[in-house]
A protein has these predicted regions:
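The feature captures the conserved acid-bearing segment of alpha/beta-hydrolase catalytic domains
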Residues: 41, 156-206
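Catalytic histidine neighborhood in serine/cysteine hydrolases
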Residues: 78, 204-219
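Bacterial N-terminal signal peptides
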Residues: 8-18
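Primarily recognizes the serine-hydrolase "nucleophile elbow" in alpha/beta-hydrolase
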Residues: 105-106, 114-169, 177
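Catalytic active-site module of serine/aspartate enzymes centered on a nucleophile-bearing elbow/loop
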Residues: 223-249
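Short, surface-exposed "cap/lid" segments of acyl-processing enzymes
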Residues: 38-75, 79-82
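N-terminal cap/lid segment of alpha/beta-hydrolase-fold proteins
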Residues: 21-45
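Alpha/beta-hydrolase active-site loop
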Residues: 89-110, 129
Length: 249
């Protein structure tokens, strides 16, 4: 009995070691939330992955609900908490480098050669800077983006005063960055109650689809409707066949 117990204990220890080692990834320091696809539909493997930049409240209800809906549609999601990442200042260049790390790892892990970016509020104001700073081999993987209630600028750092709805403009204007992105479909979804919104300023940019919803900053918590609008606006990018470009090495 004692010998059997010792053998069992040794086996359990041996089994635990690889598990601990395999859990580590090159992007663990970014504290990402992952929503892998559980679908067995073969067609889903050709859909893009999603990187979701959260609002300044962190990985909260809207971010997680919309991401879960997208995962059910066959698109695995990497959730990136703006609250965690931007609690200390990051430059646009540093943000782009960390985004590149995410693409490099999860495009291989999930075998997806295309990616769609979605940002909510603070996240929508920052991800255009990441797109415009991508090296060509990663830039070509980005096939679409959705900006949910973005304002016109960002500080690339979370300020408590932002939660008090102060109106001071951020250090980095978002509009010039979005204007540099002309080759992929973009959705800009905004609320009729928002002031200082970026979306109306993009009305003349041909690759941008503008949609307005009621319900304030979180669109009345109608997460299924938000997901539907994203899927509609980015349908060509989502359904397009995988290009010959393999995930970047």
């Amino acid at each position: 009995m004692m010998i059997r117990w010792c053998i069992t204990a040794l086996l359990l220890c041996a089994l635990q070691l690889p598990l601990s080692a395999s859990a580590a990834t090159p992007v663990d320091d970014l504290e990402l939330d992952l929503l892998p696809v559980t679908s067995v539909n073969p067609a889903d493997k050709d859909k893009p992955m999603v990187v979701f930049f959260s609002g300044d409240g962190g990985w909260a209800e809207l971010d997680s609900a919309v991401s879960a809906n997208l995962a059910k549609q066959g698109m695995p999601v990497v959730g990136w908490s703006s609250l965690t990442y931007f609690w200390s200042f990051k430059t646009p260049e540093q943000t782009a480098k960390d985004f590149q790390r995410i693409l490099a790892y999860y495009s291989k892990e999930w075998q997806r050669s295309r990616v769609i970016l979605i940002g909510y509020s603070f996240g929508a104001e920052t991800f255009p800077f990441a797109i415009t700073r991508m090296p060509p081999e990663y830039r070509k993987m980005i096939v679409g983006g959705a900006m949910l209630v973005p304002s016109i600028s960002s500080n690339f750092e979370i300020h408590v005063s932002d939660w008090l709805q102060t109106s001071a403009p951020g250090r980095y204007p978002t509009l010039p960055e979005v204007k540099k992105i002309q080759d992929i479909p973009l959705l800009c979804l905004y609320s009729e109650l928002e002031e200082g919104d970026l979306c109306p300023l993009l009305s003349k940019q041909s690759n941008v689809t503008l949609m307005q919803l009621s319900g304030g900053h979180n669109f009345g918590k109608r997460y299924a409707l938000i997901t539907k609008k994203i899927l509609q606006a980015l349908a060509p990018a989502i359904q397009a066949p995988v290009s010959q470009a393999a995930p970047a090495k």
